[in-house]
């Protein structure tokens, strides 16, 4: 007789294979059709609120794997808080202004055509470009299963948003922190604009390293008693025409050599080795004796004043620093102190202008020459004063967009002064920011010191740009006096116009139209400031325009979390902190989380030329979004994250194990209608174990340590749960009577674990969790329509005195012997065996549980049969023997008294089925 029909075999509609690339888009589309974000908001009304404020990606190009990592990590954190029972807010946004978009438009038009167009037309084309890529990126993010307020995102180019950026600027001006002054700033000659620190990238560059002798003038020669020269060292010969000083350190010892050179004593040996100085020390010189005396610039014969500055070191060079206040921050500072002339002979395109002729700095042939191309010619002009020249490779600042080396150039710019105090406050903006860093929680903790040191060392923030596509620094200036009009009514009226017409109004309307009626100002006396704001000011104001304005249902200010790549310590985290610190005197965030960058499996940066680029949409098409999401969760995001086909295959294998574990549970609880609370020893053990593991997982997730949490979950599934418990339950699940207490207890334990585990995986594997709910029996899903009706459900408190370490060791030693017996073909199945033992820990279990633990046909104190092996655990003897009874054709245990007969348990079950059927 075939007993298969009498077995309670697993049944589920949940498929073994996910077919993720085909099925995910359909389910995602359903989510967005029924607006699950709104559903999530409604289902947590009145609950504690969690706000993640989205750092805006740039509306240019398709998303790359770094974007995917960032948005998925945000999505996981938002969903984790949701499944924890909190109300959540996640309003996505885009950075829409700035140079990269303007460059794309310029590329399409060509520079000549762009220069012929009015600003309003250029801005219109930039707006179209940004809008196109907002649409593209929005769909790409949605295709990653990211749930957010996609219907009401924030765009920094929206009219009301532009008005709020402008209002934030006006608030800072009101605090007295906005200053306009001429100062050297990072200048991109290729893009013809000033740059902020965050827009500068360091790349290797080959530069001429030169040592130049500046002869001391008569007065200085008299002072030291000998004709001599001070040697300076520089890697920017092109700045020498603008030299107005030579800086020495007041605390360093200098020497005069017998061949007539003044250098730092500590660097003399090095300079001798290089053949620059040949003489020995003639006498020691105090730098203070040379202060305010002069040397002669060999390029043009102009006098160069000797000044003292703490910035001069003896790490390299000569101990004497060539000082051109128009070309460097330190030079500028020391120049202010000594009132040195600021010469700026370089135009916005990085070429020498007419200043070199007017001020007699260089011959006329240099006019119009790019400064970097002029280096060699300047070296030729130096003649004998050039003591040594060699090329060196060094790290040099480059423009983040054009990738061309930048220059320092003194121009009139707008700055946020970090060392000034906001109105009515004793603390400077820098002090406010540093205090707020101390109050902020950092994930990982090292982010605190990184942000702190950047704020400690940062200069004033240059917020003006000489470009077209951005929010204008919309102030009026009195033509005669140069005074800027900060009249609150004037500023408010401009903001109102921007809200209605966008900031294009600054370019399309006249001064008269921009002044409020009856302002009392004569439009003919005023001119517009035509600079635009640094794009980092836009994104630094998002808290103001999104969280404070209440135009968006985006959550609370300050936000619970800001989350971006580790490069944002110098970017968005800092700009947001400075804008918020200036206006609100506090940080706009309670916590900052940073992640590393994506690299290939060898740890190398991705590039098209290397062919190691992993595109998120390619991963989605090949493996499925769930695999990408699981990769994010299982990677240590605190350092750089490795991704490759190999790594994704391993992640896919882990996903398969997880999916199959859920499938097994669903298939085996399909006939369970109510969860019971009367459990056996093994059920209590697995429930207690699961509770402890799930609490650890939840704790790690709360600290955003998803990799540690998933590692603990995976270990539990592979080892104790799927590896032991589900295996030992198979006999009772398939062969016991439908309502047998052992069977129902195990099903109940599984249902509880499935429910609790579902809430834990849902933030990461939302698609799979939703699919599980769809196919789950009612005992698991209750009235849930989808996964968004769920919350993390803690397991009940269950006491277990099961000696896990002892029992797992016994099972493991037994299985080693079973493997040997199978290899030797002595047995085919462990059910052919029985165990004889005196172990009180094993014998304390009821007969069924101890048999199931080892998957044998009996475990007794004494069984007389053929011995096949033995082992010991903590001194207790276990003897493995051949089963003496016959194989039951239904359960395959060797417990039948006669050949072909059923064992006692199976006979009862079959009899019961026959009675029920008659």
UniProtKB/Swiss-Prot annotation:
This is Isoleucine--tRNA ligase. ATP binds at residue 608. GO terms for biological process: isoleucyl-tRNA aminoacylation. Keywords: Aminoacyl-tRNA synthetase, ATP-binding, Cytoplasm, Ligase, Metal-binding, Nucleotide-binding, Protein biosynthesis, Zinc. Its cofactor is Zn(2+). L-isoleucyl-5'-AMP binds at residue 564. Pfam families: Anticodon_1, tRNA-synt_1. Zn(2+) binds at residues 888, 891, 903, 906. It comes from Nitratiruptor sp. (strain SB155-2). NCBIfam families: ileS. A motif ('HIGH' region) lies at residues 57-67. It catalyses: tRNA(Ile) + L-isoleucine + ATP = L-isoleucyl-tRNA(Ile) + AMP + diphosphate. A motif ('KMSKS' region) lies at residues 605-609. The gene is ileS. The keyword Protein biosynthesis applies. Catalyzes the attachment of isoleucine to tRNA(Ile). As IleRS can inadvertently accommodate and process structurally similar amino acids such as valine, to avoid such errors it has two additional distinct tRNA(Ile)-dependent editing activities. One activity is designated as 'pretransfer' editing and involves the hydrolysis of activated Val-AMP. The other activity is designated 'posttransfer' editing and involves deacylation of mischarged Val-tRNA(Ile). IleRS has two distinct active sites: one for aminoacylation and one for editing. The misactivated valine is translocated from the active site to the editing site, which sterically excludes the correctly activated isoleucine. The single editing site contains two valyl binding pockets, one specific for each substrate (Val-AMP or Val-tRNA(Ile)). Its EC number is 6.1.1.5.
